[in-house]
Amino acid sequence: MIETDAVVIGAGPVGLFQAFQLGLQGIGAHLIDALPQAGGQCVTLYGDKPIYDIAGIPVCTGRELIDRLLAQLAPFKPHWHLNTLVAALAPQPDARLLLETDTGARLLARSVFIAAGVGAFVPRTLKMAGMERFVGTQLFYQVLPAGMDVTGRQVIVHGGDEGAVACAVELAEQGRAARVSLLYRRDLFQAPEALLQRLQRLRAAGRIAVEVGQITGIASSGMPQCSTLRALQVVDAQGASHALPVDVLVAVLGISPRLGPLTDWGMAMARKQLQVDTEAFRTSVPGIYAVGDINTYPGKRRLILCGFHEATLAAFAAAEALKGDKVALQYTTTSAHLHRLLGVAPASGATGP
């Protein structure tokens, strides 16, 4: 059992800023996200698209914004639970909140901040009978597990977007796999030009094989409960079928949002969004706050900068609830206390305890 003052569900831009604002209040946080990396849809869907309405930043991409937020958050050393879904959330007799994840972790928190956007983004899966047997051993969605050894193995990356191309290119450049194939329904990929040029160079050198076609079946060996994936049956544009040997399959098919069990946690909702007050962005369940696109209130605007405002007020409210007293307003420009929390040298003229 992990006991903590705060859990933030969702590691998109608003969730990251929520953890930062909690850090300024001296509150450590655990961050949980369904994706294998921080950033939410800001990275996964809009990583290379420009954002023009973040205060003080004339323009940045979604990925650049997340990189800046992660750097800003770094001094507070949050605890990460990535590739993880919250399966259950329930108030306890002592007013704390018990969270259970799909990985088996249990967290007992004094406050919970839901920054889940339009829901937990989960990978789109292959809709093919029998594929589920290989998930986590030979079949992986979106990314390979960190540190996985593919030496001497035949790896197929299935997908046509930037994530798929990047995965195949990285594997080929590492040079450990016996063969790297990029499988997609057509020989046209959606990725930045620089990445496509790397792909072309690797193709020309014979280090990546691009396979055009669609998966229609699989070949495996062994008993059903302990079988091994051996090959994919693929049909090309001309209708010809052939087998592609495979040891490791990485399916990069995009992601889709899912509210999941959130609707069962007893909070008041309207049109699939959590109803909150505008003083502290509290939900109808004590100790649970909701910020960003997941919440709704009169005048709501689904903008990142509005989520930053909500996260700030929620952090102040939670700090007062946890400490049982009003929280003094301090400024990062002058507060020696905040400078110590941030690990920065005091500015000239800084004051405070």
Swiss-Prot record:
InterPro entries linked to this entry: FAD/NAD-bd_sf (IPR036188), FAD/NAD-binding_dom (IPR023753), Fd--NADP_Rdtase_type_2 (IPR022890), Ferredoxin-NADP_redctase_2 (IPR050097)
Residues reported to bind FAD: 33, 41, 46, 86, 121, 293, 333
Cofactor: binding comment: Binds 1 FAD per subunit.
Protein name: Ferredoxin--NADP reductase
Species of origin: Verminephrobacter eiseniae (strain EF01-2)
Oligomeric and partner information: Homodimer.
Protein family according to the UniProt entry: Belongs to the ferredoxin--NADP reductase type 2 family.
Catalytic reaction list: 2 reduced [2Fe-2S]-[ferredoxin] + NADP(+) + H(+) = 2 oxidized [2Fe-2S]-[ferredoxin] + NADPH
Source domain of life: Bacteria
One GO molecular-function entry: flavin adenine dinucleotide binding
Enzyme Commission identifier(s): 1.18.1.2
Keywords, comma-separated and alphabetical: FAD, Flavoprotein, NADP, Oxidoreductase
Keyword NADP part of the UniProt annotation: yes
Cofactor(s) listed: FAD
